Swiss-Prot record:
Domain of life: Eukaryota
Residues with glycosylation annotation: 45
PANTHER family: OVOMUCOID-LIKE-RELATED, SERINE PEPTIDASE INHIBITOR, KAZAL TYPE 2, TANDEM DUPLICATE 1-RELATED
Species of provenance: Oreortyx pictus
Domain Kazal-like as annotated: residue spans: 6-56
Record note on domains: Avian ovomucoid consists of three homologous, tandem Kazal family inhibitory domains.
Classification via Gene3D superfamilies: 3.30.60.30
Disulfide bond listed as a keyword: yes
Pfam families xref list: Kazal_1
SS bonds (residue pairs): 8-38, 16-35, 24-56
Entry protein name: Ovomucoid
Taxonomic path: Eukaryota, Metazoa, Chordata, Craniata, Vertebrata
Protein localization: Secreted
Site residues (Reactive bond 3), renumbered to this chain: 18-19
Hydrolase found in the keyword field: no
Amino acid sequence: FAAVSVDCSEYPKPACTLEYRPLCGSDSKTYANKCNFCNAVVESNGTLTLSHFGKC
């Protein structure tokens, strides 16, 4: 079982695109795209992780 991860090193960004490529966070919330997810990861001080790609 490989852990899924996303490289958030270039975040946070001030604005995200409207691109829809959903990711499911460890908080059971669906994030619209990597940018939204990574901004949330930064805000959570790294406690939020990627559960899987796609909707929760």
